[in-house]
Design a protein with these regions (language model features):
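Non-heme Fe(II)/2-oxoglutarate
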Residues: 1-63
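Short, surface-exposed charged micro-motifs
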Residues: 70, 98, 135
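Conserved short histidine dyad/triad with adjacent acidic residue
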Residues: 70-91
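Short, conserved beta-strand element in jelly-roll/cupin
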Residues: 73, 90-107
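Tight coil/turn sites that cap or link beta-strands
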Residues: 76-78, 123, 131
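Short beta-strand His + acidic residue motifs that chelate non-heme Fe in jelly-roll/DSBH
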Residues: 81-83, 107-110, 118, 128-129, ...
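A short hydrophobic beta-strand segment most commonly corresponding to one strand
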Residues: 95-100, 125-127, 141-156
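A short beta-strand-loop-beta hairpin characteristic of the jelly-roll/cupin
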Residues: 100-122
Length: 156
């Protein structure tokens, strides 16, 4: 698939079997992350991801090079405020993918300037725009755990 078009902010790419990875979530060592002025959340970065998660990433066949992978956990009802991820190098062909692992229909990803709101369902691979204003509105009483993958020169 080509990268997202100018008028697209997300795309559901394919189904993903989560069974091999869900059991590995319980024993993870989460780290509190968040810079001044940014939202705090719990993360597990690439070097600490269990082999089950790394195998899932490899099995997605994204092509290109894995630049960054992180599990991001939000507490119940914890939102991510509107922001643009502008820290990625402009000269690289970065694409962002999300695999929701634990979520709820009341957790919505929004691109307010584009008028798009969507619940990213677990068990699917999505490509999402990070270079437009986006946010997460978390209206549920459960955690939200997503695998976020930044890939350079992806060919999927």
């Amino acid at each position: 698939l080509p990268k997202l078009g100018e008028n697209e902010v997300y795309r559901c790419i394919k189904a993903v079997d989560l069974a091999p990875v869900l059991g590995s979530l319980g024993g993870l060592q989460w780290t509190r992350a968040g810079q001044t002025g940014k939202y705090p959340c719990d993360v597990v970065i690439k070097k600490a991801l269990p082999r089950e998660i790394m195998a899932l990433i490899e099995g997605l066949d994204l092509g290109g090079t894995l630049a960054r992978a992180v599990l991001r956990r939000l507490a119940p009802r914890q939102d991510i405020p509107p922001h643009v991820d502008d820290w990625m190098p402009a000269e690289a062909d970065w694409r962002r993918f999300q695999v929701p692992l634990v979520t709820h229909p009341d957790v919505v990803m929004r691109w307010p300037d584009d008028g798009v709101s969507v619940h990213l369902e677990p068990g699917f691979l999505y490509e999402v725009r990070y270079d437009r204003t986006h946010e997460v509105v978390h209206g549920a009483d459960c955690e939200r755990i997503h695998l976020q993958i930044d890939q350079v020169n992806a060919t999927i």
